[in-house]
Amino acid sequence: NKDKSRKKKKPKCIALATATAVSLEGTRESPLPASGSCEKVLQELQDTQQLGEPLVVTETQLSEQLLETEQNEDQNKSEQLAQFPLPTPIVTTLSPGIGPGHDCVGGASGGAVAGGCLVVGAGTDKTSELIPGKLESAGTKPSQERPKEESFCCVISMHDGIVLYTTPSISDVLGFPRDMWLGRSFVDFVHHKDRATFASQITTGIPIAESRGCMPKDARSTFCVMLRRYRGLNSGGFGVIGRAVNYEPFRLGLTFREAPEEARPDNYMVSNGTNMLLVICATPIKSSYKVPDEILSQKSPKFAIRHTATGIISHVDSAAVSALGYLPQDLIGRSIMDFYHHEDLSVMKDTYETVMKKGQTAGASFCSKPYRFLIQNGCFVLLETEWTSFVNPWSRKLEFVVGHHRVFQGPKLCNVFETSVSAKPKISEEAQNRNARIKEDIVKLLAETVSRPSDTVKQEVSRRCQALANFMETLMDEITRADLKLDLPHENELTVSERDSVMLGEISPHHDYYDSKSSTETPPSYNQLNYNENLLRFFNSKPVTAPVELDPPKVESSYVSSARGEDARSTLSPVQGFEGSGGSGSSGNFTTGSNLHMSSVTNTSNAGTGTSGTGNSGDGGGGGGADGTGSGAAPPVTLTESLLNKHNDEMEKFMLKKHRESRGRSGDKNKKSANEAMKMLEYSGPGPGHGHGIKRGGSHSWEGEANKPKQQLTLNTGGGGGGGGGGGGGGGGGLPLFLDVTHTSSSSQNKGPTGVAAGGAGGGVGGGGGSCSGLGGNGNVGSGNGNNSQPSTNQYTQSGLPCTQNINLWPPFSVGITTPTSVLSSHTAVPPSSFSPQHSLFPTFYYIPASIAASSPSSTNTNPNRPHKHAHVHSSSEKPSTSQAAAATMPLQYMTGVMYPHPSLFYTHPAAAAATAMVYQPVPFAGVANPMQLPEQASKNVYTTQPVMVAPPTATNKTQGAFHSITPAPPQRPSSQATSVKAETGSNVAPSDTSKKEVPDSPITPTMGDFTLDQPCNNNATTLKKYTDSNGNSDDMDGSSFSSFYSSFIKTTDGSESPPENDKDAKHRKLKSLDQSDNKIVEHPEEDQTQHG
């Protein structure tokens, strides 16, 4: 069976090859055939084989088709009839080369001989363009005797490179008998120097064919090779072996085809490669010259030669072959200098100099003088060349030179392909050396950097532009430096770690971290205002206590009238609450004033009414409860480190902006609120509220800085005001507990959380709200006082941002209180920034004289007009810049003789605090120290002694719980207050504070005991204890400012420990103060909006 199948396949293949040959011969002018016709014939052969029809029938059918196609060519017909009926002798030639392993020769794959055959179409250009569809039509052309073919075609299997078919014209072109190539490798007939070129064309052509879907007409490539001529007896006689082999140049057109796969009779699966066929159409290349020294016309074809800057030829057009006699591969890689006539080298040097000059302009070209060029047969042709070059735009180096050549005069020998016989011309040594030097000079010239004519001018212009740009940048820096500073605070990416450190009560987070954040904007101002410098400024400022506060807060009538604004004051943030403790009415005013600076803060706590006084503060907190209810449900109540960070960022931004304004244009910044600015500047205003303002004036910068973190706490607290209406507002009465912001955020101590809860809890602190979960969970303090149930925390929550007024404190240190105030007014909505400047700049604690405090503690929220010294102290500490007004309106009362933490602890609107401060009597800065102590006490005592605090909510002294300082006003302080004092030995509660409270002049007491002096402010403290003061902010401010100040300032006392607690409480207070703020907002929504606006 195998033998039979082989026999059948062989005739089929022969018939196919013959048919293809005939069709090619008959279609000289037709495009190269596609695989369609061949496949058609092959398919018919396969069909007949499958049907089991006799092979003779298949042969007959094929011959008939071919006859029809070549009707007009009798000679072709006779050849077909003779060859198709029986296997011709070619079969014997094929069989040896195709053994059993080459079954594909039988064309089982549809003409894919030898497994898969690549069809390479090589022949004349016309023949190579044959299209399968035109095979039949070609035969219709008038028949004439087949002329001597100029080209031939052959089919080669890509499986093994064997020639499967050749057209009869091969005999005319190369002299080989038609069947001599069959079964032999095509490469054997290619000149050895061109075999690499042929192989590279095959390897690159196959991928092209595959990528184009093996479309033969699309995958055609052309190249030139030398093919061997036949050495026959006719041409050379009998000495075949001794004669040299002659080669002739041919242009080959390659076309890849893929024959269709089909099942083999023996079930042998044909691989993809077996289907590839290569059709080659070979066309001989003739010399362009007819006569020696021929002068060619201007229309003669041009050819291009490209060489690199080193003179190495990199590309040659195939059109140059007939003109020069070199194949492209013969020239590529050689030096162009070797082909110039030695006498023309000087001319070529001039030409290349012009090339370099023209290279300065992209795309420029020029024609050079004619010069002589060596061709393959050893003669010279005269060339006219148009030169262009390409210069690398980045390196400005010449990449390559392209010469478009036209032969002006031909060689003496017309056949350019003859072997060169002439010997090299004799040249003297001197001439050779000169020529070598010229060649080297040309190469060096081409290697030079190409400079553009305009480069010099452009460089000069660029230098001038750069100098001008630098000059303008310098001017802009000087002119817009303040603006840049202002923009910086708005950035949201202030260093969180630094803020956190402040909140956590690190040693010197306030100023150092703030400086680092703002170092880019105002590095000098922040770097100069280091912590030690802030302390020195604070002490040197000798801030006046309550009496020093000016009426500028009063100027804001709404803030000034502490009595009429009782309710609003109760809603004020903790800072305001403290001021309001003396005259809780101020907290209402604070709402208005703070609204100017930070409308968001004050409005909320309006619900907590003027009862912000120490005793009434609890009531005020209750009023805030309504607002607190709204905010209490809000998750934000929980004070988290992230919220504190966010708040600190805002406060820091505000403080930076405020500081810039104060330094660059303190007057301009004050435009937003001239009254507030005046308040800030005149910290020693006569009004009781001035106590707060004085405190701010004395240490705006540090207070503002400290306030930042505290205000952040307040913001966090705002959410949790809940039922408590803000611990500070409800229970806080006049004395919101001061918790270290740091502690609150960390919530490591139970007291810190308790302070928060106090804001939420109805107790003296939270006013029954107790919803300040964010600050510290349930407020034990809150449970005690129903009076404090009013949610003043909301005020703090809403007004937490407004507390930014406190920021004014920070700039005042560096610039002046007035500037901080203006900054606060502009940044009213950003309480953290307002507090933080103060925080960072100055110690958290201020000492408030006991004498002033004594008068103020007597009156609780009941007497809104009468400012409590404690509240004043607190507001002064909290609002030296922004808190002054706020404190006046705030129900919080500062305890005389107690050091209160920075106003930033109280998350009250700095503006509101400032306004309130104006109204209230000036409170000694000792009050600031009190708040600082209070936070610790508050955090410790409030949690532990909350029941005691709750019991005396009516007593104004309960406010002490917030400040928790043992001051000469112990009577006001409830039993819980006493407990608080015990708990916070290092905080305001220290017993020694009582005596110090009496000394209003001392801004800061050396020990924590001094800070405790603000005990009188504790009227609200009992209920608020730590953060219970009218606005939980007090504690918050105390916490953040106190913690940092404590760590750096009061390491000897419990203060270091209390700051964390205070921070926690401060957070609680902030929440409470936010609730109170909400209440206030209800009372003075218009003012609040104005502030926010």
Curated annotation (Swiss-Prot):
SUPFAM superfamilies: PYP-like sensor domain (PAS domain). Residues 557-637, 681-735, 781-800, 856-885, 960-1093 are annotated as: Disordered. It is found in: Nucleus; Cytoplasm, Perinuclear region. SMART domains: PAS (SM00091). A motif (Nuclear localization signal) lies at residues 1-12. Residues 610-631, 717-735 have a biased composition (Gly residues). Residues 150-285, 303-409 form the PAS domain. Residues 789-800, 974-993, 1015-1025 have a biased composition (Polar residues). GO terms for cellular component: nucleus; perinuclear region of cytoplasm. Changing residue 733 to V: In strain: Porto Alegre 4. Changing residue 622 to V: In strain: Guana. Keywords: Biological rhythms, Cytoplasm, Nucleus, Phosphoprotein, Repeat. PANTHER family: PERIOD CIRCADIAN PROTEIN. This is Period circadian protein. It comes from Drosophila willistoni (Fruit fly).
